[in-house]
């Protein structure tokens, strides 16, 4: 009963997720926060708190996590940071999208028909690496991918990478950065 579960879904009707949330509510009594892209969905009905907004998934998660940390006395700069967000974040996100568009178009032209695309990451970038490959490329674009951690790269994958192999490497700014940099330095150019 002292548990909060945050669930994110595009449709809000995935059978296994719906069953899991029902079980969590019935057996644990957890409070459920539902982020669902669709405006009508079973997961919205099951959520104690509901947000139906189909963009910026990571931003929603971070905002909720930030608030939990603030409420727990672990984020003393919270109010100042969110005052800055209120002033600048919306416009800055639009500007970043505009600036990224030419790169995104060229990347899409180059990789839209990859037979297989590899995504490599570690540390604080592993979640983004994994979900980008699976959710965006496989589920949404129907393109074959493989996500692999940077530390696993040298245990097999490096044997099959050539100059023509499409590889995207996520390099974070945490203690595992050297692992991803090692992969980046190894990849043939």
Which role does the model predict for each range below?
Residues 50-51, 57, 69-148:
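Active-site phosphate/pyrophosphate-binding segments
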């Amino acid at each position: 009963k002292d548990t909060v579960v945050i669930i994110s879904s595009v449709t809000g009707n995935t059978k296994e997720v719906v069953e899991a949330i029902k079980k969590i509510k019935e057996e644990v009594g957890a409070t459920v926060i539902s982020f669902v892209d669709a405006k009508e969905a079973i997961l919205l009905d099951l959520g104690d708190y509901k947000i139906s907004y189909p963009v910026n998934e990571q931003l929603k998660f971070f905002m909720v996590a930030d608030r939990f940390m603030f409420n727990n006395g672990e984020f003393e700069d919270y109010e100042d940071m969110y005052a800055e967000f209120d002033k600048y974040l919306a416009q800055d996100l639009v500007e970043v999208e505009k600036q990224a568009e030419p790169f995104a178009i060229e990347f899409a032209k180059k990789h839209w028909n990859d037979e297989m695309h590899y995504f490599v990451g570690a540390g604080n970038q592993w979640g983004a690496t994994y979900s980008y490959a699976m959710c965006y490329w496989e589920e949404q674009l129907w393109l074959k991918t493989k996500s692999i951690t940077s530390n696993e790269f040298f245990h097999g994958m490096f044997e099959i990478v050539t100059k023509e192999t499409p590889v995207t490497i996520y390099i974070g700014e945490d203690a595992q950065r050297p692992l991803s940099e090692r992969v980046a330095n190894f990849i043939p150019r």
